């Protein structure tokens, strides 16, 4: 494992995952890999173990997901992995740690309220493994009340990442959307792409937001 991107959703994790892959750190395990690889039940098990009692997951347990087929992912980003900053930093001590954050906390909150939160509420597939996984992290991360608890979760999570990195004496890059290639490449010790290579701008939620706008 080379890189752990432990920021919350809607902090530029998808763009950063694509940037890392362009830099040769590939593959990156992102939220979209969960359904594609039928990992929802395993992540649900991990959440239940963390919040409902059990032995914390370590490298062996995470490798059931991230090392499937004997080929470990080179990095990870976004939920559900980011729910486990302390456990992942402990499990993969060799990995660089990046915390993606938004310049404006309120804009992050608003972005969540226009994407992930209504998507869960409007999901018609409530018997699916992916829905049950989402229900678990909505329950345990913000007590099923993001408008009330979301901002506190954002602050608590970011501090937990900082503290976990500090306990392992690991360098931490706090990366904000718009910072571009230079600080990322410097942190990872990699050459910066040519000036004509744009930093990725990716957003899996654009279609969802467009459909909501059309219905309004």
Regions found by a protein language model. Name each.
Residues 87, 109-173, 179:
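PAPS-dependent sulfotransferase catalytic domain
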Residues 1-60, 133-142, 192-216:
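PAPS-dependent sulfotransferase catalytic core
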Residues 88-114, 184:
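Conserved phosphate-donor/acceptor-positioning beta-strand/loop module used by diverse small-molecule
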Residues 3, 14, 189, 195-198:
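A generic "structured core" feature
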Residues 45-88:
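Conserved nucleotide-sensing/catalytic segment adjacent to the nucleotide-binding pocket
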Residues 13, 81-86, 105, 180-184:
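Short, well-ordered alpha-helical microsegments
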Residues 6-8, 31, 77-81, 101-102, ...:
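Short His-Asn-centered micro-motif
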């Amino acid at each position: 494992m080379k890189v752990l991107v432990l920021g919350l959703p809607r902090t530029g994790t998808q763009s950063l995952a694509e940037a890392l892959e362009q830099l040769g750190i590939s593959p990156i395990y992102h939220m979209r890999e969960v359904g594609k690889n039928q990992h929802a039940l395993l992540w649900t098990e991990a959440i239940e173990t963390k919040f409902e009692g059990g032995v914390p997951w370590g490298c062996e347990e995470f490798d059931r997901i991230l090392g499937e087929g004997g080929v470990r992912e080179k990095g990870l980003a976004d939920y559900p992995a980011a729910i486990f900053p302390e456990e992942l930093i402990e499990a993969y001590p060799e990995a660089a740690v990046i915390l993606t954050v938004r310049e404006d906390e309120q804009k992050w909150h608003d972005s969540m309220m226009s994407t992930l939160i209504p998507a869960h509420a409007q999901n018609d597939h409530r018997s699916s493994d992916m829905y049950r996984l989402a229900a678990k992290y909505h329950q345990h991360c913000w007590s099923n009340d993001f408008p009330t608890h979301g901002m506190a979760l954002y602050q608590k999570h970011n501090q937990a990442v900082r503290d976990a990195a500090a306990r392992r004496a690991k360098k931490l890059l706090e990366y904000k959307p718009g910072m571009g290639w230079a600080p990322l490449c410097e942190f990872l010790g990699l050459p910066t792409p040519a000036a004509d290579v744009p930093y990725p701008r990716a957003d899996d939620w654009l279609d969802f937001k467009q459909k909501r706008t059309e219905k309004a």
